[in-house]
Swiss-Prot record:
<keyword id="KW-0238">DNA-binding</keyword>
<dbReference type="GO" id="GO:0005634">
    <property type="term" value="C:nucleus"/>
</dbReference>
<feature type="DNA-binding region" description="H-T-H motif">
    <location>
        <begin position="89"/>
        <end position="112"/>
    </location>
</feature>
<comment type="function">
    <text>Transcription activator involved in the spatiotemporal regulation of flavonoid biosynthesis specifically in the corms of Montbretia. Activates the promoters of enzymes involved in the biosynthesis of the flavonol kaempferol and the flavonol-glycoside kaempferol-rhamnoside.</text>
</comment>
<dbReference type="GO" id="GO:0003677">
    <property type="term" value="F:DNA binding"/>
</dbReference>
<dbReference type="InterPro" id="IPR017930">
    <property type="entry name" value="Myb_dom"/>
</dbReference>
<protein>
    <recommendedName>
        <fullName>Transcription factor MYB1</fullName>
    </recommendedName>
</protein>
<dbReference type="InterPro" id="IPR009057">
    <property type="entry name" value="Homeodomain-like_sf"/>
</dbReference>
<feature type="region of interest" description="Disordered">
    <location>
        <begin position="118"/>
        <end position="144"/>
    </location>
</feature>
<dbReference type="InterPro" id="IPR001005">
    <property type="entry name" value="SANT/Myb"/>
</dbReference>
<keyword id="KW-0805">Transcription regulation</keyword>
<feature type="DNA-binding region" description="H-T-H motif">
    <location>
        <begin position="37"/>
        <end position="61"/>
    </location>
</feature>
<dbReference type="Pfam" id="PF00249">
    <property type="entry name" value="Myb_DNA-binding"/>
</dbReference>
<feature type="domain" description="HTH myb-type 1">
    <location>
        <begin position="9"/>
        <end position="61"/>
    </location>
</feature>
<keyword id="KW-0010">Activator</keyword>
<dbReference type="InterPro" id="IPR015495">
    <property type="entry name" value="Myb_TF_plants"/>
</dbReference>
<keyword id="KW-0804">Transcription</keyword>
């Protein structure tokens, strides 16, 4: 068996309340007090349902109801209470003086509920991952890793040879040293035949001539074109020695 309805719903006014109906309801409640909502319409002379009379009084006509828009502080309090209590609007309204449960429920369904849902959905949304365009086998950009990587050289074919100036200078110095060695050998050869030349020159001149054969190496180096020959001419050698005496 279900609960008995408060009225038969026949011949009842529906829709917006008129100002005369509000005045009759307020006067009756002030005289007899709240309660007994099933029999109140009949005793007050209203063609309204008992439930409709109760909601009209609690949500609009009772004293102490706060009129106007809900402030930001009240919004924050409603959000926190809803997180704790859920959709228990009567308990939430009991902690907001001057606000009715019906008003808070309507404000939540039209404004706060959608806003809180969008904020929570935005916070729970994962950040999109940025795909990297680097190849899979690319080494990481690390100085230590790059330093330890092996260096692979590419084979190249040598088509030309280049000699630096230092190499040319070394060749020139070696050539000069070879020339000095050759001059020294020539000087030693001349020194070994010195006594023979002195004797032959003395016989050719016809007098006892004492010729100093101590020819220096520096003097022989002045003659770049001088070369020792096996068939040397004694007369030309004597002329050469005379020129040596004139120098000294």
């Amino acid at each position: 068996m279900g609960r008995k309805p408060c009225c038969s719903k026949e011949g009842m006014n529906r829709g917006a309340w008129a100002s005369m109906e509000d005045k009759i309801l307020v006067t009756y409640i002030k005289t007899h007090g709240e309660g007994k909502w099933r029999s109140l319409p009949k005793r007050a002379g209203l063609k309204r349902c008992g439930k409709s009379c109760r909601l009209r009084w609690l949500n609009y006509l009772r004293p102490g109801i706060k009129r106007g828009n809900i402030s930001e502080d009240e919004e924050d309090l409603i959000i926190r209470l809803h997180n704790l209590l859920g959709n228990r609007w009567s308990l939430i309204a009991g902690r907001l003086p001057g606000r009715t449960d019906n008003e808070i429920k309507n404000y939540w369904n039209t404004n706060l509920g959608r806003r809180v849902h969008d904020q929570s959905h935005q916070h729970c949304r994962p950040n999109p991952t940025i795909t990297s365009t680097k190849p899979a086998d690319a080494p990481p950009a690390n100085a230590n890793t790059v330093a330890t990587m092996p260096v692979r050289t590419k084979a190249a074919r040598c088509t030309r040879a280049f000699f630096s100036d230092d190499l040319s200078d070394q060749k020139e110095v070696a050539a000069n040293n070879d020339g000095l060695d050759n001059k020294k050998e020539e000087f030693d050869a001349v020194g070994s035949i010195g006594p023979l030349l002195q004797e032959n020159v003395g016989n050719a001149v016809g007098e006892d001539t004492n010729i100093d054969m101590a020819v220096s190496l520096d003097s022989l180096l002045l003659f770049d074109s001088f070369q020792v020959d096996d068939g040397i001419n004694l007369q030309s050698m004597a002329a050469l020695l005379d020129s040596e005496d004139q120098w000294f």
